[in-house]
């Protein structure tokens, strides 16, 4: 997990000592199954987050799908800033078991997890597509490619979705310079 930044995996306690986040239920299950991953801080809603290497993403996604995470709610990317890493994320839900659980208990909590893959922005960032596991990844992976330049190996339609095919660059990267754009100066 060399590309996963340490700033994402540690917090400080009252004394200032670095404390690793507690593994959540999904992380504990992955550990029992022998999958290497990094434990990340839960998000602001308490959703468990894990960091994985690009090479093992399909295996971990398949394992999670077999463990009930049957729905890809969202896939996307973001840029941590110029000179920093690009991040590709997958938000998985256990929908089938949720429907069954809600029949018995309407307040049942939905199982969800967010997988993050940290990529070097230099060269051509790429990772395996999970289109074969989750068909909903089709347009979402294409949009991430179109906006950030992250290529998804094995995707059946690897072309731009929103921008023209001849567009240069990746518009949502923070170091992107819009072609033929001139900033207007105030008249004052």
Swiss-Prot record:
Cellular component terms (Gene Ontology): plasma membrane-derived thylakoid membrane
Topology of this chain in the membrane: Peripheral membrane protein
Gene Ontology biological process terms from the UniProt entry: photosynthesis, light reaction
Localization annotation: Cellular thylakoid membrane
Alphabetical keyword list: Membrane, NAD, NADP, Plastoquinone, Quinone, Thylakoid, Translocase, Transport
Family per record: Belongs to the complex I 30 kDa subunit family.
Protein name: NAD(P)H-quinone oxidoreductase subunit J
Name of the encoding gene: ndhJ
